[in-house]
């Protein structure tokens, strides 16, 4: 299997467009199309359906996509191992991370890492918890930074605990209180970020048998807090996410006190590429000091 064909197929599948795939790979659109057509000819079935809006995966393409990702990942790892044997530090690391971690933790880690390994390329994907886990499951990310949980079926390295807090309007009766009782979420107007399914918040409320009164949902936490600022409800989040953020709201610890554990996910620490192992060690060293 030719890797150039696989890369063309993967880029087209992820971009949904031959033109965008060509831009990513620095090819022409016709060149990408020819590579994919050759791959389809070898396999004996279509991988992509061409439409007026771009390209979409066929049922067969959906089945082949994970295998193609795995093939390219192993090829990258092979090149990294060869370079490592020759004393060269090269490689590619795909990182998926929480917004709070991508904003407040990773810049320092990446800066320190790149000083020593300037030839290792880092690709950072930012998303909510379910997106991070999905990208890990699909093989799109080599390392995931998110909160822990029973649903993690990969190698998990805890790094730090983070307090859960309530985001309240300034005129809220408990804006100056020492804590915000989670029980109030049964009747308070709750604004839920993370596409309306913040897994950290939902897990916390489920622990106490609380069915929240969700009145608004947003994709981004910052959008949820802007709604809070305008008196449209309250929100819940982890403290790291609001670090350095300025908005006219009150931030109050929840009661009973709750925290989440933030850390790293890897498909396998043992079988990780040399570049990924190096980054993992840097992350542990830098973030354990937080």
Which stretches of residues belong to each language-model region?
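Short helix-boundary/capping micro-motifs
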Residues: 11-27
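A short LG(V/I)-centered, amphipathic sequence patch enriched
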Residues: 40-57
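Alpha-helical linker/hinge and terminal dimerization helices associated
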Residues: 42-43, 64-86
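Flexible hinge/capping segments at coil-to-helix
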Residues: 87, 153-164, 168-190, 274
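Central regulatory/effector-binding core of bacterial HTH transcription factors
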Residues: 90-152, 218
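Hydrophobic hinge/microswitch elements
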Residues: 128-133, 137-140, 147, 196-252
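Beta-alpha-beta core module
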Residues: 153-158, 162-163, 177, 223-271
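Secondary-structure junction motif
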Residues: 174, 188-208, 272-280, 290
């Amino acid at each position: 299997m030719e890797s150039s064909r696989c890369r063309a197929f993967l880029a087209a599948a992820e971009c949904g467009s031959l033109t965008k795939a060509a831009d990513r790979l620095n090819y022409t659109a016709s060149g990408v199309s020819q590579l994919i057509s050759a791959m389809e000819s070898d396999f004996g079935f279509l991988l992509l359906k061409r439409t007026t809006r771009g390209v979409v995966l066929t049922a067969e393409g959906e089945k082949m996509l994970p295998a193609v990702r795995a093939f390219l990942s192993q090829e990258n790892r092979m090149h990294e191992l060869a370079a490592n044997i020759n004393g060269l530090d090269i490689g590619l690391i795909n990182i998926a991370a929480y917004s709070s971690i991508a904003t407040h933790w990773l810049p320092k880690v990446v800066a320190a890492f790149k000083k020593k390994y300037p030839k290792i390329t880092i690709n950072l994907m930012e998303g909510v918890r379910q997106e991070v886990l999905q990208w890990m499951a699909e093989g799109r990310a080599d390392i995931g930074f998110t909160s822990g949980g029973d649903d993690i079926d990969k190698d998990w390295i805890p790094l730090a605990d983070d307090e859960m807090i309530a985001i309240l309007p300034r005129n809220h009766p408990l804006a100056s209180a020492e804590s915000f009782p989670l029980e109030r979420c049964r009747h308070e107007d709750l604004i839920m970020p993370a596409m309306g399914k913040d897994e950290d918040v939902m897990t916390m409320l489920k622990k106490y048998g609380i069915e929240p009164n969700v009145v608004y949902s947003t994709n981004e936490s910052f959008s949820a807090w802007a709604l809070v600022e305008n008196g449209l409800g309250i929100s819940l989040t982890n403290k790291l996410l609001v670090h350095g953020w300025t908005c006219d709201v009150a931030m109050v610890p929840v009661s009973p006190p709750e925290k989440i554990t933030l850390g790293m996910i890897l498909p396998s620490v043992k079988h990780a590429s040399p570049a990924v192992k190096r980054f993992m060690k840097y992350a542990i060293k830098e973030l354990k000091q937080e």
